[in-house]
């Protein structure tokens, strides 16, 4: 499926990628591989622009460990802060993807009844 994406997307280091149901991180690792190995992106830039959401806590922790191990092949830097920020345990429908934070029901409903 990733082969259907225009090569220009993979080359552009400023493009972000999101796996909204990342499971064990297979797609995340494939994205990072494509960015770093196949397109020579800076590893820190590549991981900084890659995001994932997983609902199950154990699977989420497992995915983060796999991502850390994969990234250790390309950098010695401690990526804990980036990985903890970019790969979250949440319900995708309760996550504000634009602001990368949990949705706040109060904010979501503000102004809803004003025009009623």
Where are these regions (language model features)?
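SAM-dependent methyltransferase catalytic region
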Residues: 2-116
């Amino acid at each position: 499926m990733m082969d259907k994406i225009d090569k220009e997307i993979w080359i552009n280091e400023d493009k972000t990628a999101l796996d909204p149901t990342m499971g064990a991180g297979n797609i995340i690792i494939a994205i990072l591989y494509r960015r770093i190995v196949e397109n020579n992106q800076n590893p820190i830039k590549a991981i900084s622009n890659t995001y994932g959401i997983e609902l199950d806590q154990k699977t989420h922790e497992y995915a983060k460990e796999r991502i850390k191990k994969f990234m250790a092949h390309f950098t010695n830097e401690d990526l804990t802060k980036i990985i903890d920020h970019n790969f979250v345990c949440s319900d995708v429908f309760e996550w504000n993807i634009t602001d990368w934070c949990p949705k706040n029901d109060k904010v979501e409903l503000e102004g809803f009844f004003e025009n009623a």
